[in-house]
Amino acid sequence: MFDTLLINAYVITMDEKRRVLENGAVGIENGRISFVGDTEEGKKFGAKEVIDCKNHVVMPGFVDAHGHGGHSAFKSIVEDTSYWMPVMTHTYKNYITDEFWYNEGRLSALERLHAGVTTGVCVLGSQPRCDSPVPAMNNAKAYAEVGVKDIVCTGPCHTPWPHRFSRYVNGERHM
């Protein structure tokens, strides 16, 4: 028996097929999601509390409304210091490969998923990396492959000029 059963919802799943259940249910036991499936199937288990979610969307998992691309891979480097931002901004502008953004996105998505986050926001294209769409595309590709839904926010928060950017492509630095 569930503590709570949400029924008749549009349930956006995290399964391999990324199904959307039109008459879905989510069962909760001891504060944890223990069932995601069809409403009729969920009702068979019984519940102390049943909540009708007709015409509502249920997305099992947490939503992280603020994250920054690149930071997962560097979270322990010079953290809690006054010079963290200048060091990281210089690093992002001059020493990061296109593959880094894919690998960092994968790491970040897996860490979020491990914490129960199924949807997140990734601020990526700010001043440190607004010269090319490649970082955002690679980061988003990794999130999609893991299955975490991600909203990538791109575009400069401050004008990037007169800053100089470089990228490493096939081991060669391009200015």
Question: What are these model-predicted stretches?
Answer:
Residues 25-27, 63, 149:
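A fold-wide structural signal in alpha/beta-hydrolase
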Residues 76-149:
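Alpha-helical scaffold segments that flank or form the walls of functional sites
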Residues 68, 125-126, 155-160:
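Active-site beta-loop-alpha junctions enriched in small/polar residues
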Residues 134-175:
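Metal-coordinating catalytic core of metallo-dependent amide/deamination hydrolases
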Residues 1-45:
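N-terminal metal-binding scaffold of metallo-dependent hydrolase/deaminase domains
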Residues 20-22, 41, 77-80, 134-137, ...:
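Short, glycine/charged-enriched secondary-structure capping and boundary segments
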